[in-house]
């Protein structure tokens, strides 16, 4: 009865992944366009590109997850392990790329000198090998936990790639949210005397938003993974299980905000464009109504 109850909840989760895939694809393309279009040449654009690349891995894994959860595809355990490793690696890689990009932006605010480009290039050469190694090691630890759990399970399905234990989810919360944010906060505290008040509040706001959204994305799954309940609760638990996928949204949006010289410029331009579009649509509607009224008057005459 327990397996049947769980299987009833998988289509809802697959549909949720489908909507996330559609909107995240549009959002990633939009943010990449805005970053390329409005970003300055002296800012760490490569940091944003690497962050988008990591989140694109997670985004394009969603159709595979949809096929597995809906029962249309079946994969052996070895391929499930590869899928799980790539999924975790993309999340860790994006988080740590965002950390180094935040450090680069803090340096950009602190040191307005001609040596800025050299410092940024040196930081980029050092940080990206570190990001690859740290992300790979952290994802490998999750993979070992998955293999140990798979040996105790008799089914050949790939559901274990999604039914993570609470211990694994706590590790992901600590590795991808808590530790990166604490490192950036510590670096920000060491450089706070070199920052203006507006710059300090801006960076601190981004970090607090990232910490809040990251906790919201991981905490429900970590807290509810080991809880057993009835059929209705299984559906809610599986929706909570999909919340980490929403990192596609807020990591890329924060990467865009931190990589741009003035991130308010494209926001203002987009808002002006939307306002003008609404005005045009409203004016066209009024014209159509007016023309219909004129036609009716002519017909009466």
From Swiss-Prot:
Compartmental location: Host cell membrane
Molecular function as annotated in GO: G protein-coupled receptor activity
Glycosylation, residue list: 153
GO cellular component, one term: host cell plasma membrane
Protein origin, superkingdom: Viruses
InterPro entries the record matches: GPCR_Rhodpsn, GPCR_Rhodpsn_7TM
Keyword Membrane assigned: yes
Cross-referenced SUPFAM superfamilies: Family A G protein-coupled receptor-like
TM helices/strands, residue ranges: 16-36, 49-69, 83-103, 123-143, 169-189, 200-220, 239-259
Keyword Transmembrane helix: yes
Membrane-side (Extracellular) residue stretches: 1-15, 70-82, 144-168, 221-238
UniProt entry keywords in alphabetical sequence: G-protein coupled receptor, Glycoprotein, Host cell membrane, Host membrane, Membrane, Receptor, Transducer, Transmembrane, Transmembrane helix
PROSITE patterns listed in its UniProt record: G_PROTEIN_RECEP_F1_2
Membrane topology: Multi-pass membrane protein
Matching Pfam families: 7tm_1
Cytoplasmic side: 37-48, 104-122, 190-199, 260-301
The family this protein is said to belong to: Belongs to the G-protein coupled receptor 1 family.
Name this protein carries in UniProt: G-protein coupled receptor homolog U51
Organism: Human herpesvirus 6B (strain Z29) (HHV-6 variant B)
Taxon lineage: Viruses, Duplodnaviria, Heunggongvirae, Peploviricota, Herviviricetes
């Amino acid at each position: 009865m327990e397996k049947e109850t769980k299987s009833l909840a998988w289509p809802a989760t697959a549909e949720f992944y489908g909507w996330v895939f559609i909107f995240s694809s549009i959002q990633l393309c939009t943010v990449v366009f805005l970053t390329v279009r409005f970003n300055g040449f002296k800012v760490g654009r490569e940091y944003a590109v690497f962050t988008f690349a990591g989140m694109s891995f997670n985004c394009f894994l969603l159709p595979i997850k949809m096929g597995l959860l809906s029962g249309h595809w079946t994969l052996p355990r070895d391929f499930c392990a590869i899928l799980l490793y790539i999924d975790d690696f993309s999340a860790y890689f994006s988080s740590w790329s965002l950390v180094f990009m935040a450090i680069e932006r803090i340096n950009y605010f602190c040191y307005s000198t001609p040596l800025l480009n050299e410092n940024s290039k040196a930081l980029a050469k050092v940080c990206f090998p570190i990001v690859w190694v740290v992300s790979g090691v952290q994802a490998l630890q999750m993979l070992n936990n998955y293999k140990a759990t798979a040996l105790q399970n008799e089914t050949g399905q790939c559901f274990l790639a999604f039914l993570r234990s609470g211990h694994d989810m706590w590790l992901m919360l600590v590795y991808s949210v808590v530790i990166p944010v604490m490192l950036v906060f510590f670096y920000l505290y060491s450089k706070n005397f070199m920052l203006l008040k507006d710059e300090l509040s801006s960076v601190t706001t981004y970090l607090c938003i990232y910490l809040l959204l990251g906790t919201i994305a991981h905490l429900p799954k970590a807290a509810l993974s080991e809880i057993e309940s009835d059929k209705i609760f299984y559906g809610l638990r599986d929706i909570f299980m999909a919340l980490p996928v929403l990192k596609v949204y807020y990591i890329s949006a924060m990467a865009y905000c931190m990589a741009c010289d003035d991130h308010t410029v494209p926001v203002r331009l987009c808002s002006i464009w939307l306002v003008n579009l609404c005005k045009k649509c409203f004016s066209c509607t009024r014209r159509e109504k007016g023309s219909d009224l004129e036609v009716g008057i002519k017909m009466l005459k």
